[in-house]
Amino acid sequence: MSILEGISSYIKDGESASHNLGLEIEHFVVDENGTQIGFGEISALIDSVGKELNAEIHYMDGYPVGYHTKGYTVSLEPACQFEISIDPYSDLKNIRTVYKEFRNTWDPVFEREGYHFETKGNLPNVELGLLSPGDIPLSPKKRYQFMNSYFNASGKYGKYMMRASASAQISVDYASEEDMVRKLRVLQKISQLLM
């Protein structure tokens, strides 16, 4: 199979009769000085809140690092960026409702601990030059240690991606290659407005 045939097959395999959108948002959790929450603290909060919600708690290497509950999944990224992955919905109202419920759950928890969400693409203290990405500790997930070793040997921007970036990502169902191309063209045009 050629590369072109492989790509074509991959696109064909992704076709769906549904018309859903998925949304993932990574957040920085910082104190008033812009310092990120530590792994031990956020892991304990995930365990506590997950149990209060009767959620299915996810563990990695023995640590609570996320949970799944009705409508969404929470997980930790390499430097404790806090991600919500909202289940796919066909209605933006449902996505908004789930995100509000997530924020209504977590905003008071973090506020009580002296933290708040920052929803920016770059960690503000790094962007301001107050902190170097190399100074930000990684969570103890083994895979992040492997990624870190690779990025340290392969260039200078991997540590920024792992430690000092957060993103929002959407997934869009498509019915055919033509439908996918049409939706990608629209998304490319509006992406500049969303940044």
Regions found by a protein language model. Name each.
Residues K142-M195:
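Internal, well-ordered domain-core segments that constitute the primary functional module
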